[in-house]
Amino acid sequence: MATIEESLALIGRGAEEILKLDQLQARLATGKPLRVKAGFDPTAPDLHLGHTVLLNKMRQFQQLGHQVIFLIGDFTGMIGDPSGKNATRKPLSREDVLANARTYEEQVFKILDRERTEVRFNSEWFGQMSAADMIKLSAQHTVARMLERDDFAKRFGSQQPIAIHEFLYPLVQGYDSVALKADVELGGTDQKFNLLMGRGLQEHYGQAPQIVLTMPLLEGLDGVAKMSKSLGNYIGINEPAIDIVTKTMKIGDELTWRWIDLLSFDISLAEAARLKEQVAAGELHPREVKLRLARELATRFHDAATAEQAIAGWHAVVTGQGDTSLLPLQEVVVPDEGLRLAGLLTAAGLTPSNSEATRKLKERAVRIDGEVVEDPSRVFTHGFEGVIQVGKRNFARVLLVTA
């Protein structure tokens, strides 16, 4: 059994803030398993690595013997979380929410231990709540308090509309903690206001206030913006292993350490520090560290054999040796007259623009099936299939098709 110090070290790994740490220490000292809650609104059908930051922390609590509650916000999903939004979010239909919720249940157990997980839906209590009960809940906070939230304050200051139902969202999320008698609630840094709302409501209803633990928002593949499906800088946990490997191997060297901190179970903080020292001293290539992370992620969401096959496919492209047919085939739609090479590189997502594609060609940084190509006007027509590589990290196995 872990000591309190060991528990705090694991719980604190990667965490942005713990409120309040002394209360967490006191509850750990009782030896009683904590009820650890994290809520997910099923606004999209698939989870990506950004979502798993919270799931990983839940798994760490499970490793310490605690019970986690994976709360599916089927009720709140129909409201739409306004956190970080500069405009009112379009609510989802009941059918969309339930369909997405089913896929969430299938995906989370790639990380969480079923035996120590409660899956709950907040429609369990909100579906029974009367209009009078909702009004009583709304009376617990003022409009002035809601406007303390940064996103609401900005929208109010710029005269952007804020719908009444958006003010309800923090209260509704906070009441989830009352209904579940949560000891700890996890959330992203953008959720802090809502999580603190839960503490206040628990006290109002005579419960001990939950400990709030916030986790950073994971940067996506570009290393800049928050991982998001809409930005295209994400890795979905249901993606093929080869995609998980190839995308992970494309991230910047500095971002690798951030991902290890927030996503890895196998690499401890102490080992990560040693690896970083070895890389800095030139004793270890950063690619080897990245490859270890890619293998861990592909194994977690698939299995060891599939992960090794994916790594073999990636290695075949990088070295020019091996079986490139292991790479996923990406279909690129081309007009009947075909597509020039510069346009093909852009259409395949290997360069952001035709001008950048032309520049890469002039630098002799483009290969097709291992051979350097330079002519931007070379035309490719439907039926062409090959592995195109731009620089060291960007490559794709493409098949040209007509619309």
Swiss-Prot record:
Positions contributing to ATP binding: 229
GO BP: tyrosyl-tRNA aminoacylation
EC number(s) on file: 6.1.1.1
Compartments where found: Cytoplasm
Functional note: Catalyzes the attachment of tyrosine to tRNA(Tyr) in a two-step reaction: tyrosine is first activated by ATP to form Tyr-AMP and then transferred to the acceptor end of tRNA(Tyr).
Complexes and interactors: Homodimer.
Chain span(s) of sequence motif 'KMSKS' region: 226-230
Lineage: superkingdom: Bacteria
The protein's name: Tyrosine--tRNA ligase
Class of enzymatic activity (EC top level): ligase
Catalytic activity: tRNA(Tyr) + L-tyrosine + ATP = L-tyrosyl-tRNA(Tyr) + AMP + diphosphate + H(+)
GO molecular function, one term: RNA binding
UniProt keywords, alphabetically: Aminoacyl-tRNA synthetase, ATP-binding, Cytoplasm, Ligase, Nucleotide-binding, Protein biosynthesis, RNA-binding
CDD domains tied to this protein: S4, TyrRS_core
Start and end residues of each S4 RNA-binding domain: 339-400
